[in-house]
């Protein structure tokens, strides 16, 4: 018969003398935070007479020989923190955003200064038959003057042939600049081919000039485009053409007569033409736009919209008689703020005096009127004295 004897002081039957107490964090602390504290009185070794004394001694020696792992920084902080305290997460280091250096600021200032000091920001040009005044707009987004003009008297060496134009660039100045530099040359070449031809041949020559100018600009693979309005005077005849929303207005005995119609996406016939070509016109923020992008429906350039924004001009031909006083060519910066008849009324008292200073004053006054009414666009105006080119 076996017999079991319980020894009260033996660790085999005695509960551990090393209780753990788990204290919940305070109500204000994070629910994820728990404070653990150990009541760690040193565990007494078995008494010398205990039969477990040799085993306890060997276990004690093994604990001393095994190095304890180094606690992490967070664990060390937890151990060093008072019992019952709540550990807080450390705030991350502040994010420092670098400020542009002096070189970058200086470069930006130099770029602005270059734009502001560009001599094309305000241009005056006059002759015996014409006056030109151009001014850069003051819109917030306006970076550089995008308008250009041309005034060529004695085109191709003929004193009775003259060519004038206003070119309103968009998406940069490159297209308008190219047109102003090259269209007069292309026009002279085309007019040589129809020397002595009738009005129909002349209109076809002007159309070929526009198409060639567009073709040559597209070869450069540059962005942007330009609206155009031109006037060709020869042998007592006037040929006015446009592609875009630059406009030509004739003063006929003091009555305004528009010789062009603006090519805008809002025009019903232009919208129908674009849709027949597979495009679309949409009203975006109150303005009708081709493919939701461009407000004009014709012009030079605009390669990404070339399928719909064509360079074919509309052309009007008429004879210069005694009632034809002067012709105003201007970009939409003027016409958006000044009506046709109003422009004639402002310019006529000054222009019919046949004085250079008065003609330039007429151009300036038209620009000032538009600016006073809120125009922030570039404005270019050419006024031509037509009687100088009558038969």
From Swiss-Prot:
Gene3D superfamilies: PPM-type phosphatase domain (3.60.40.10). Residues 129-386 form the PPM-type phosphatase domain. Residues 1-53 are annotated as: Disordered. One of its GO terms (biological process) is abscisic acid-activated signaling pathway. Its cofactor is Mg(2+); Mn(2+). GO terms for molecular function: metal ion binding; protein serine/threonine phosphatase activity. The chain crosses the membrane at residues 95-115. Keywords: Hydrolase, Magnesium, Manganese, Membrane, Metal-binding, Protein phosphatase, Transmembrane, Transmembrane helix. It is an enzyme of class 3 (hydrolase). GO terms for cellular component: membrane. Mn(2+) 1 binds at residues 168-169. The keyword Methyltransferase does not apply. Its EC number is 3.1.3.16. It is a single-pass membrane protein. It catalyses: O-phospho-L-seryl-[protein] + H2O = L-seryl-[protein] + phosphate; O-phospho-L-threonyl-[protein] + H2O = L-threonyl-[protein] + phosphate. Mn(2+) 2 binds at residues 168, 332, 377. PROSITE patterns: PPM_1, PPM_2. Binds 2 magnesium or manganese ions per subunit. Residues 8-51 have a biased composition (Low complexity). It is found in: Membrane. PANTHER family: PROTEIN PHOSPHATASE. Belongs to the PP2C family. This is Probable protein phosphatase 2C 32. It comes from Oryza sativa subsp. japonica.
């Amino acid at each position: 018969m076996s017999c079991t004897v319980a020894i009260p002081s033996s660790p085999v039957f005695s509960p551990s003398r090393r209780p753990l107490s788990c204290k919940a964090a305070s109500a204000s602390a994070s629910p994820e935070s728990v404070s653990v504290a150990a009541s760690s009185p040193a565990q007494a070794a078995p008494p010398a007479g205990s039969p477990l004394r040799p085993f306890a001694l060997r276990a004690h020696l093994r604990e001393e020989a095994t190095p304890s792992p180094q606690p992490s920084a967070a664990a060390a902080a937890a151990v060093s923190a008072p019992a019952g305290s709540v550990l807080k997460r450390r705030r991350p280091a502040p994010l420092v955003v670098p400020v542009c250096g002096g070189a970058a600021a200086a470069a930006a200032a130099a770029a602005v200064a270059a734009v502001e000091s560009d001599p094309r920001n305000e241009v005056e040009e006059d002759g015996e038959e014409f006056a030109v005044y151009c001014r850069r707009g003051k819109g917030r987004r306006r970076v550089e003057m995008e308008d250009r003009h041309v005034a060529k008297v004695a085109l191709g060496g003929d004193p009775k042939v003259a060519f004038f134009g206003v070119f309103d660039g968009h998406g940069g100045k490159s297209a308008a600049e190219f047109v102003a530099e090259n269209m007069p040359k292309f026009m002279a070449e085309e007019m040589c081919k129809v020397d002595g031809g009738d009005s129909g041949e002349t209109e076809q020559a002007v159309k070929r000039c526009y198409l060639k100018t567009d073709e040559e600009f597209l070869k450069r693979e540059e962005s942007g485009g330009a609206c155009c309005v031109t006037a060709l005077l020869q042998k007592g005849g006037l040929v006015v053409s446009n592609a875009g929303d630059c406009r030509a207005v004739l003063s006929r005995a003091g009555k305004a007569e528009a010789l062009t119609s603006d090519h805008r996406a809002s025009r019903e016939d232009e919208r129908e033409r674009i849709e027949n070509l597979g495009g679309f016109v949409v009203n975006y923020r109150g303005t009708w736009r081709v493919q939701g992008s461009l407000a004009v429906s014709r012009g030079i350039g605009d390669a990404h919209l070339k399928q719909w924004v064509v360079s074919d001009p509309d052309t009007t031909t008429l004879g210069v008689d005694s009632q034809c006083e002067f012709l105003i060519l201007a970009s939409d910066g003027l016409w958006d703020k000044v009506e046709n008849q109003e422009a004639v009324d402002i310019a006529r008292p000054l222009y019919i005096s046949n004085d250079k200073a008065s003609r330039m004053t007429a151009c300036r006054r038209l620009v000032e009127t538009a600016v006073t009414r809120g125009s922030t666009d570039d404005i270019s105006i050419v006024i031509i004295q037509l009687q100088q080119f009558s038969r």
